[in-house]
């Protein structure tokens, strides 16, 4: 009898602990739940659809390597539909440019721009391609309702790389 009671007690603790929390904490420490999360997601979606936002990098995660925390501010910014990025690149390059800076540097209007809002998972996904004279970048940006997200960049001449940071407008 004692073991059954102990088992039920432990089982109820596990169920309570695994219930999860639907509270999201934003970058500035605010806790959002329910309606606030939906409003924040709509605000982020609006910023992205209007083409006016800045994604600020907090850490860089090269494929097959440990995270790197840059001491300089790197951003992907969109202003009036023009996307600009100057980002560090750590990883394998399959074609090195002589005298180049080695980073990911682009400016222009995105091609194949696709914005998808997933209200069930509280995130916005942005996919686009940027063609530069010497390189093409396929960019995927996923932002959650807490304004924190992941940006992954794929190029035919480099290994994929991910950047973690937050979005602001």
Put a short name on every predicted segment.
Residues 1-4:
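Positively charged n-region of N-terminal signal peptides that target proteins for export
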Residues 6-11:
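Hydrophobic helical h-region of N-terminal Sec-dependent signal peptides
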Residues 14-17:
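C-terminal motif of bacterial Sec signal peptides marking the signal peptidase cleavage site
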Residues 34-93:
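N-terminal secretory signal peptides
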Residues 19-22:
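Bacterial signal peptide processing site
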Residues 24-25, 31-35:
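N-terminal, Lys/Arg-enriched amphipathic/low-complexity engagement segments
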Residues 24, 108-169:
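Helix-rich interaction surfaces within compact, conserved domain-sized segments
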Residues 67-70, 75-76, 85-121:
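Phosphoinositide-binding peripheral membrane targeting modules
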């Amino acid at each position: 009898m004692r073991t059954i009671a102990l088992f039920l007690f432990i089982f109820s603790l596990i169920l309570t602990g695994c219930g999860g929390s639907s509270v999201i904490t934003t970058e500035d420490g605010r806790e959002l739940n329910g309606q606030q999360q939906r409003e924040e997601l709509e605000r982020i979606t609006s910023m992205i659809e209007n083409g006016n936002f800045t994604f600020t990098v907090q850490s860089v995660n090269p494929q097959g390597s440990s995270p790197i925390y840059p001491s300089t501010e790197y951003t992907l910014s969109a202003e009036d539909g023009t996307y600009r990025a100057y980002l560090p690149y750590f990883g394998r390059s399959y074609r090195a440019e002589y005298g180049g800076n080695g980073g990911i540097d682009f400016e222009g209007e995105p091609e194949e721009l696709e914005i998808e809002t997933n209200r069930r998972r509280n995130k916005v996904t942005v996919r686009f391609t940027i063609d530069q004279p010497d390189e093409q970048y396929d960019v995927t940006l996923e932002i959650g309702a807490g304004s924190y997200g992941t940006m992954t960049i794929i190029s035919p001449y480099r290994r994929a790389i991910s950047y973690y940071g937050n979005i602001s407008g």
